[in-house]
Amino acid sequence: MKISLIFLFVIFSASLTFGQKPIPGQTSFAKPFILGVIDEIQSNELNEKRILNIYLPEGYNPKDTIRYPVIYLLDGSADEDFIHIVGLVQFNSFEWVNQVPKSIVVGIATVERRRDFTFPTNVTEDKSANPTSGHSNRFISFIEKELQPYIQEKYMTSSSKTIIGQSLGGLLATEILFKKPELFNKYIIVSPSLWWDNGSLLNQPLARFEHKDIYIGVGKEGLAPTKIPRVMEVDANVLADKIKNLKNRNVNVYFDYLPLENHATIMHQAVFNSFRLFYP
């Protein structure tokens, strides 16, 4: 069962709305600020309903012939990264900025990150600390077999598909790049948790692919939470070099070290930077 509801973001107070103040004696003019829609999809792959927060660009008309790129955002709940990433997309697509094409943003609301974003680990400590982890294969199947077909059928989409993932979401985006690169044209991988399973993903073969833009951003993050010491900045750099060394045709790889950012602050700046690199 798939349903759509209005996604409402209420302005903090009437006094903040466009800088205006209510006129004495008149009722408040405050009203909801519509940011997008909340959609719901029943997933057979995950055996559960999943919430999708959808941003549709200004001028979007389902009866029109214009089709839009789609940006798929992991950790896409309203209280996660959806609102500030949508702000970046909207701002950069304003006519007077014209940095990014008008795009649809699909925020995949999080249910259980460790379950959905990680593959099985052989590290005993990780298994004990995260007993439900290791089912990224099901989540990738959900994206491939259910989510993307649903979005393509319901919305006016082009063939351009971007994925954005940070931390464990960056690990998942990297796994998709390794195993199912055809699912996306552009990969925005931020502070990926490549330490998972003692960095085993970095040792796996990387499928050959063409026509990709890949951004890998990392801040000053230091040691990963592993028994065997791993540095997140080093792992991210190793990933970038591994992709570059394939010398695939028409593949652009951008490694971006942001020393003023940490694991908590990097997401917004990294996505902003990726847009500048993808759309010079």
Task: Map each language-model feature to its residues.
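Bacterial Sec-dependent N-terminal signal peptides
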Residues: 1-25
